[in-house]
Amino acid sequence: MGSKLGFTFGVLFASLLLISRASAEENGKWLDVQLPHDSPVLLVGFNMSPTTVTVRRSSMLLDLHETLVLRNVGNQPICGLTLRVEAQDLTPYGKGSVIKPSLFVLPGEEFPVKVDMQLIRPISATKSESAMVQVTLDCALFSNLTAYGPDKLNSRRTLMVYEKEARRDRQYLAHLLDTGQLPELREELNFGIQDVAPRQLGLELLRGPRTAAVREQALAVNPMPFPKAAVQPLRGAAQVAGNEVRAPRVEVRNISKMRVASVAMGWVVRDDRGDDFVAGAVTSPVVIGPVQTSSISESGTLRFSRSTGQPMVIDKLMAFVNDVQFSDGTLWIPSRADIDAATQDPELRREL
C-alpha cells in the first residue's frame, strides 16, 4: 500500500512539475520584466542561472537565480534602484524586492541586477497567460535626489538614506586623504587589520501572535543621542525574553523647527557577555510638530540573533535615531561628528 501511494505521489509530483514548466514555456517565459515607456532604465538582457520549482501541496516554491542587465536611458546618473519581484500578490510569500543602493550609473551605461530569492505561487495560477514571475520598477533615484517610479515599497526613502550615508562617508574619507591623515584613513578602510570580523546581529520584526508563553522581564531602553540630531530619544521601555523584545516604546522629542513625517529608530543590543551590537533600524511613520514630544512604539516583537545562529540573551537595550524624514521629503542623517560623539567604542562607531 505504501509503495503504491509513493508511486502515485511521485507521478503526481512529476506531472505538476511538468505542467508548471510547460505552462511557463507555453505562456512565453519564466520571467517578464515590465517597464513603463518613460522608464529611465531599459532591459538589455538577462542570464538565468539554475532556477527550480518545487511543488508544495497546492503551491509551487520558485527558487529564483538570475541576473538582469539594465541600461540607463535617462539623462541623469542613477544612484539607486529598487525592483519589485512578484509570483502572485495575494500573500507576502509571493512577492519580494531587490534594492541596489549607492550606484553611479551614467546615461548610456549598463549595470547588472541580481535576483536571488524564493517565492510561492499557487499551482492554479499556472493557467494564467502571464509569466510565472513579473519584475517591475518601484523606484529609481537620480544623482540630484529626485526619483522616478510608483514607490509602493517606500523605496525612495530607503535609497535616499543609503545615498546620503555614502556621500557622507566619501566626503569624510576624502577629508582624511586631503589632510594627510593616512593612519586614520587606513583604519577606516581596515587596511593592516588581520582577520577582524565585524560584530553582526540579525533583526527580525515579528507581527504574529506568539506560539508559546514565555517569561518576560521589563527592561529600560537607554537613549544613545547624537548631539545635532533633529529628533532626540529621551527614554523608553520594553518587555524582554531571551533574544526577543516585545512592544518596545521610545519617547522622542523633535528639537527642529520642521514637521517630522517618519523616524527610523536604530537599536544597539548588549548581550550577557558585555558585547554591543548594532542590530539595524525600524522606520515608523509618526507626525511630530516642531519642538514637540511624541512616542514611537512597535506592536510587534523584535527578534535579535547572532550571525552564527548561536543563542543570545539581551542584557541591555539602547536606541538611537538612525534617520528622520520631514514632511517636505527632506532627510536628516547623523554626521561623522555625531557618531564620534555618541560612543568611544571604535567598532561600534564603524557599525554606526
What spans do the regions from the language model cover?
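Bacterial N-terminal signal peptides
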Residues: 8-18
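Beta-sandwich strand segments
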Residues: 94-95, 145-154, 276-278, 329-338
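Positively charged n-region of N-terminal signal peptides that target proteins for export
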Residues: 1-7
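Short acidic, flexible loop segments centered on an aromatic residue
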Residues: 73-93, 138, 257-275
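Short, surface-exposed ligand- or partner-binding patches at beta-edge/loop junctions that are enriched
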Residues: 123-144, 305-327
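Sec/Tat signal peptide C-region and signal peptidase I cleavage site
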Residues: 19-24
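Low-complexity, acidic Ser/Thr/Pro/Gly-rich terminal tails and inter-domain linkers that flank the onset
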Residues: 25-67, 73, 90, 157-251, ...
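Intrinsically disordered, low-complexity Pro/Gly/Ser/Thr-rich segments with frequent PxxP/GP/PP motifs
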Residues: 91-127, 273-311
